Amino acid sequence: MAAITASAVNEFRQATGCGLMDCKKALVENEGDFEKAVVYLREKGLASQAKKATRVAAEGMAYAAVIDGVGVIVEVNCESDFVAGGPLFNEFVSGVAKVIAKEAPADVDALMACPWYTGKGTVDDAKNELFLSVRENMKVRRFERIEGKCVPYVHMKGKVAVLVELETEASAEAVTELGRDVAMQICALNPQYLDESNVPAADVEKEKEIRIATAKQDPKNAKKPDAIIEKIVVGGLGKWFKEICLLQMPFVKDDKVSVEQHVAAVAKELGTPVTVKGYVRFEKGEGIEKRQDDLAAEVAKMVKG
């Protein structure tokens, strides 16, 4: 039997839309015959997956957890909230997180080729097996893995997930409440940056120019010199930083202090420094353009078969 080349497997994968390992196995079992391999996949119930691969998967869930001391956040998409709320999909997402924590894959492609956490097959195999049950297009969209002291937060069954990384000598248990409070702040207000020092200088300059132009159009500033207007605007940038930077934001549970001040107060109580080192926020379906179906047309299509 001729060897099955990587290019042949890739070509077959592009033609069918099925998983890499499934395509390779189908070709091996059928001695490289594409037509027989397609029949093989159809018999396994996998070929229909290719037809659904182009359908928009904008539902699903964002998930965050700490697994064996490793922080993981991942977004997995499917087509309907019905499937997203089911136990099989939730188990798959949880399993994906376990694999990410253990295997530390470089990207999604590498993740899909990793061994499944049960020891049976790969992540791609597990996804294909789930497809046979739910019959929906699914995709592991993105993930982050952090080896540090992390606190996870999942909002509304996976609509938003947040992973906060803290730097401290305090125990994970001691900073759990703080981390959760900060994560809830991130979830609700979606800050663009951790701290004002992280805001690119070009963005600050652009905001400054916009505010100066706006101020000059205000009749109250008609007689003020440009230098005075600029000074007023620069002084007002602090308010802008409070809107876009996590640590400068008013703390949601006590808006008399900033998040940074609240963290400092907790650190003082614990008797050891605590720093918010970073965070990741995933919102389910963020940036995915959902298909807008015409219900009447869809029903008519179903009736016609």
Enumerate the predicted regions with their spans.
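N-terminal assembly/interaction segments in proteins that build large macromolecular machines
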Residues: A2-G305
